[in-house]
Amino acid sequence: PYWDQIGTTIVGRHVFDMTDGWDGQPPSGIDHVVVVSHRPAPEGWDPEAPFLFVDDIEAALAAAQELAGDRIVEVAAGDVGGQVLAAGMIDEVRMDVVPVVMGAGKRFFGSLDAQHMLDDPDVVIQGDRVLHLRFRVRR
């Protein structure tokens, strides 16, 4: 199972705020969450919660790799995911496609200045109303 392999997840402040910081408990049994934000932890945030707030993706990647040890570092999509992809630090992209068409929304990787190519999917798992895909990032 993929979730068992993740040691640390990197998210942006938007995801952290939308989830209310998962009430201080990282999601899906993940050990640590690194939050990229120019703002500090929310007032009253438990300093013992396994969340680390950093200013940029370089600090986030370094901290996440140290915290994860030999486990996977996962990066959420959105602006932070796009920044890490643009920095050439993403090995693979996993996405789940569901049959819902939105009229508008946010870009999967925020705003990217350059084109980034993905290989054909090397994993395709069809579930009930969901398609799980994994793509290697071309270098």
Model-inferred region functions:
Residues 1-89, 99-139:
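Portal/gating segments that form or line small-molecule/metal binding sites
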Residues 96:
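Extracellular, beta-strand-rich glycan-interacting domains
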